[in-house]
Amino acid sequence: MEYKINPIYRRIMLKISGEALQGTENFGVDSSILDRMVLEIKELVNIGVQIGMIIGGGNLFRGSRLVQFGMNKVIGDHIGMLATIMNGLVMHNALHRVYVDSSVMSAIPLQGVCDNYNWMRAIDLLSNNKVVIFGAGTGNPFFTTDSAACLRGIEISANAVFKATKVDGVFAHDPIQYPNHNIALYEQLSYQDVLQRELKVMDLTAFALARDHNLPIHIFNINKVGALKRIIMGYREGTVITK
């Protein structure tokens, strides 16, 4: 595809689930997916797109499952935060291998492992074309990485949040639950549409943050090669949610 000259977004917050990194593996990281992701990120960095990133930890730890068997929710969330740091370090190393400068910032102190989160420092790094990977969520239990992505996106003045999923966007019904049905894909929605139709885009805390700060949300399929770049260059892909 021949792309338009200039990206429509100059600074983005990219949210990748741990599940997306896991790919077809039973646990951990699928190296082929990781390698493809970092090459796509490199391509965007090379055209001047500033990228903040948050990665979930579900490929390494699912606290919600252990809570059912008696684990304290706060402890489970703390372990989940550490899982996001682990994924962040994996991404940091993979970007380094393809000569993309990046920095990992943690919402909880991990001296000697990564930098402490500082929003002014993060903006400075982004402005100098470095990818910034935000780890440990918001640093507080009971908040999802979706909430962290919207919060950090607002703090760094991102133009939009991009949520990478395993489906092509937002559907009227879950296409994974109904694989043999012809379910309509919404190309564009308003925040109000999502609330009225009770569409499960992200948790309500995250969604309210984005809505209240007029932060567009793009939902797209991470397994669709080039999908992220197509959106950033102004082409229709996945679902966009705006006011």
Swiss-Prot record:
Means of activity regulation: Inhibited by UTP.
Membrane-spanning segments: none
Database matches in InterPro entries: AceGlu_kinase-like_sf, Asp/Glu/Uridylate_kinase, Uridylate_kinase, Uridylate_kinase_bac
Record's keyword annotation contains Iron: no
Positions with a binding annotation for ATP: 15-18, 58, 62, 165, 171, 174
Any GO CC annotation of this UniProt entry: cytosol
Entry keywords, A to Z: ATP-binding, Cytoplasm, Kinase, Nucleotide-binding, Pyrimidine biosynthesis, Transferase
Catalytic activity: UMP + ATP = UDP + ADP
Similarity section: Belongs to the UMP kinase family.
UniProt protein name: Uridylate kinase
Location within or outside the cell: Cytoplasm
Pathway(s) it belongs to: Pyrimidine metabolism; CTP biosynthesis via de novo pathway; UDP from UMP (UMPK route): step 1/1
Protein task: Catalyzes the reversible phosphorylation of UMP to UDP.
EC number: 2.7.4.22
Listed GO MF terms: ATP binding; UMP kinase activity
Subunit structure: Homohexamer.
Pfam families noted in UniProt: AA_kinase
